[in-house]
Amino acid sequence: LHEPYRRQRQMCIRDRQCPVHKDREPGCIPACSITDGFGGAGAYSDGKFNITSEFGGWLTDYLSNDEVEDVIHYVDNLYLKHGATKEITDPTTDKVKEIEHRGYAVGLKLLRAKVRHLGTEENLRIMTEMSNELKQHMDLQFKTAVQDIIVEDHHATGIVLENGQTIHAKKVVLAPGRDGSAWLTKVLSNQGLKLYNNQVDIGVRVETSNIVMEEINKNLYEGKFVYNTSVGTKVRTFCSNPSGHVVIENHSGTMLANGHAYHDPKLGSKNTNFALLVSHTFSEPFNEPNEFAHEISKLANKLSNGSVIVQRYGDIKRGRRTTYKRLKEGYTDPTLPEAVPGDLGLVLPYNTMKSIIEMIEALDNVTPGIANEHTLLYGVEAKFYSARPKVRDGFESEIDDLYVAGDGAGLTRGLAQAGANGILVARHI
């Protein structure tokens, strides 16, 4: 809401409790603490701030690359103001070019970016500082569900809360985050606005030894590669976490694999984890890609009794399930002990699994050892694409004085562009 006022059904930053902290009660009510609350999905991420317009969102559909990167640098300076690390990777070194060359030789494209790794614990501290600063200039209210928006003469004039209370404002900004995308779709559809999305990413979280990933970790921190498979799909690496931990996220009752890494080396593991995601694009008449991913993920939940499945790559190639005995005999110690050994072949569609295998074999030419039989795959990991409404200058919707922003509006996919999107909306208002 413009008037500086903010309503949110989830929790404030200090009340968010990640299930990773085993001595605490997981904060899953009213929503998952990893993805919901102040700071959104970014607050409990491992805090990779990618300074690039090449990935992390679609702001370049509306602005030039230079304009987007200028705002990203502005957001980056805000993070630095609140104590973010000054360390940043250099994607232009000779060593990076050598890695890129090896990738091209086998059909892998490297996406370069300067990366400022904040770390999960530092990211939370920075978000807390930002929250405290905002409280000095605006009213924040949490655990308050917004039911609808008020529209009069094609102008947004306020919101309706779940308890029936109405709040009026000159401008309304909807930025509900990834887990609020379904809510945003419902609210805007009820107003007659059309939203567009027919894609979802489905894959696994890969975990291997830091030794295997040492060259990538040292020179890139996160190696973002894209690969076109023999079955016509596109696979990408995503969210690499050196010395990281695999975790479980609760997406509205669907348990998904994910990963994070701390900035403090003392909190790290001996493993690196990253996602391998296969893009799934559908044609008519099907128009529920996110539900498709939920159903696949729920099958893994059912087979693992409410958790996620872990399988050794060697067992996948042999067409057999991983057992507790085989997992224990492996050289990679899983950082997510709650994951249940099983068979991802019973869960993932054929083309999805084939795409993942082809990608791992290609990556083995860039980082030798990743295709060894002890590499672990956790499933399912999915990235839901939020439906995107049509927007005008300043990300104003087709309803006057109603603005949308961030991952929940299908405009961004990461810390940098999400922050930039918010700044652009604020400047326009």
Q: Where are the predicted features?
A:
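A conserved short coil-to-beta-strand element within the FAD-binding core of flavoproteins
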Residues: 142-155
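A glycine-rich dinucleotide-binding beta-alpha-beta segment and adjacent secondary-structure elements
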Residues: 339-412, 419
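A conserved FAD-binding loop/helix module that cradles the flavin
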Residues: 183-186, 408-429
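Short hydrophobic core segments
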Residues: 146, 159, 166-178, 402-404
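Single conserved hydrophobic/aromatic residue that forms the stacking wall/gate
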Residues: 1-9, 13
